[in-house]
């Protein structure tokens, strides 16, 4: 997917001050309930999970615990399993078309974390803000829907239904469903000591979109202008937007090629939170140790200048439609990282070895002084495409 021209509201007969992100108070997957609260809220669901059919299901495969975003349900006939996920987010960027693509990629990412590359069907869930004018609704929502549809088509699937409601905030999400044979998905519970951890997208999207909004807020911009330029912020924002809209499908396919043992996608709990969730699911007594943090260029410096208010260096900064965190055999990891950059997969994208799996007690941590890998933006070298439907 090529880089895009900046969204211009006036091209759609909207006021030049229109901002999609003003129709929510939370951004992206930053809407997630805190992990500790979530665990308590869902305890009763975990206790009753498959209780009525435990004998049948338990004999087929281990169940996934709370904190993992995909359900795997063995079907009663044919040796097949239903793999399904649902997710929704709030607007995080101001380009409606790209926001639709990001929302779709975010839903699909949970399937990709299971190594599933084919999605049989998608539903779209939309909350249309009752604070929008009729013109804003009629101009903006079709762009969001088109972006969602285009991303689904890129994934080889289609949107066949869903639900649309009025809501104070804009809500964007969906359901992704597929039926798989056992060899078409990878249960996220087989990490072994000696594996390495690979990440397929850089961190820092939440920082990039936040500071991009600060360009219009002098009191906030003044806090960071000594460590970052306006051009740096614009590039980081564009890079974040392209990364969030990029499907994790290629990485999902390569998980099979290079014998991945477990994976999860990085979203609202940050890299540490999702690493901890994944560690809890492991059959073996292992722990994950993260040594390296690949971060969008200049966003680590911005985070530090803000007193680390984003939690980026601590691994708690939310990501939206982030990369896959994959446990790979040590001898396969470098080959995985080389292969995912190959032009055969389109533009090719980086992946990074960021840590190790060692014997432990099913926990995850980031070392005290992780190495920050500054990830230079690729958007500056890509072709620019206009937004669909814009008038000149």
UniProtKB/Swiss-Prot annotation:
Binds 1 Mg(2+) ion per monomer. The keyword Magnesium applies. Its EC number is 2.7.9.3. Pfam families: AIRS, AIRS_C. The modification N-acetylserine is found at residue 2. The record marks 32 as: Important for catalytic activity. ATP binds at residues 32, 67-69, 87, 110, 161-164. Keywords: Acetylation, ATP-binding, Cell membrane, Kinase, Magnesium, Membrane, Metal-binding, Nucleotide-binding, Nucleus, Selenium, Transferase. The keyword Iron does not apply. It is found in: Cell membrane; Nucleus membrane. GO terms for molecular function: ATP binding; metal ion binding; protein heterodimerization activity; protein homodimerization activity; selenide, water dikinase activity. It is an enzyme of class 2 (transferase). One of its GO terms (biological process) is selenocysteine biosynthetic process. Its cofactor is Mg(2+). Gene3D superfamilies: PurM-like C-terminal domain, PurM-like, N-terminal domain. GO terms for cellular component: cytoplasm; nuclear membrane; plasma membrane. The active site is at residue 31. It is a peripheral membrane protein. Mg(2+) binds at residues 69, 110, 265. It catalyses: hydrogenselenide + ATP + H2O = selenophosphate + AMP + phosphate + 2 H(+). InterPro entries: PurM-like_C_dom, PurM-like_C_sf, PurM-like_N, PurM-like_N_sf, SPS/SelD. Belongs to the selenophosphate synthase 1 family. Class II subfamily. Synthesizes selenophosphate from selenide and ATP. Homodimer. This is Selenide, water dikinase 1. It comes from Bos taurus. The lineage of its organism: Eukaryota, Metazoa, Chordata, Craniata, Vertebrata.
